[in-house]
Amino acid sequence: MIGDFGAANDAQRSVADRMCRYRKRHPFDHVVTTGDNIYPDGDPARFEAAFFEPYDCLLARGVEWHAALGNHDIIFDDGRSELSEPAFGMPRRNYVYRLLGLRLVVVNSNALDYEWLADATRARVEDRWTIVAFHHPVFSAGLHGSTPGFRPSLPRLFQRRGVDLVLNGHDHLYLATKKLRGIRYVVTGGGGATLYPCNPRWFVAFCIPRHHFLYVSLFADRIEVKAIPLTGPPFHAFSTRGL
């Protein structure tokens, strides 16, 4: 899981390199993004430098990507170039991906479709876990802060639907909230773009401006989330056991 990463700079390449090295001991076959995949505007002329080149060590080994659209991704052509590139794994602007008991709901928060989201988060019997990923944060203590208009409607919806984890980006930092209505909200915006400072907010459990990616593990009884820096062990970790 990464967000706010497609800057084609040294920080992005360092995070990508750490992902590739980490995968050798901690295998993963999927990468989910919280958007801002291609800075500054989603121009396909930058796909090679900002996506294919830094993540070649993952793409060449068949790692599947499931991207969300961020605000920068829609400037050039409303995101159409990213949507039409198979490597980003976006069949539509809003989509559901299901795998081995996981229901991953990926949302275009540039134009939030509440009715679609309410239906998409309605889990089936075979869905053990529901994770929702989109760009603009419900709760954030960074430069942009929490997104106006998302509260209280989205937290209430996610609680009703039994969502287990919400993953956002937009603010270039790492933030994990306290459990709010039984749900953890994470801002993972440290994939390569210039970092933003954290501000004190009542809902924050942990916040740090640091480049990173998330390693998310699914078990029968819990989800484990680890924030992985450029070097060294995870700097934050938590588990959630659902509502």
Describe the role of every protein-language-model region:
Residues 27, 39-130, 142-165, 171-219:
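Extended active-site neighborhood of metal-dependent phosphoesterases/phosphodiesterases
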Residues 6, 109-111, 187, 226-232:
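Secondary-structure transition/turn motif
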Residues 209-243:
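A short C-terminal boundary segment appended to hydrolase-like catalytic domains
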Residues 36, 137, 171, 221, ...:
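Flexible loop residues that form catalytic
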Residues 4, 35-36, 70-71, 135, ...:
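Active-site glycine-centered loops adjacent to acidic/histidine catalytic or metal-binding residues
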Residues 1, 32-34, 104-106, 131-133, ...:
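Structural motif
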Residues 1-46, 140-141:
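N-terminal active-site segment of His-dependent metallophosphoesterases
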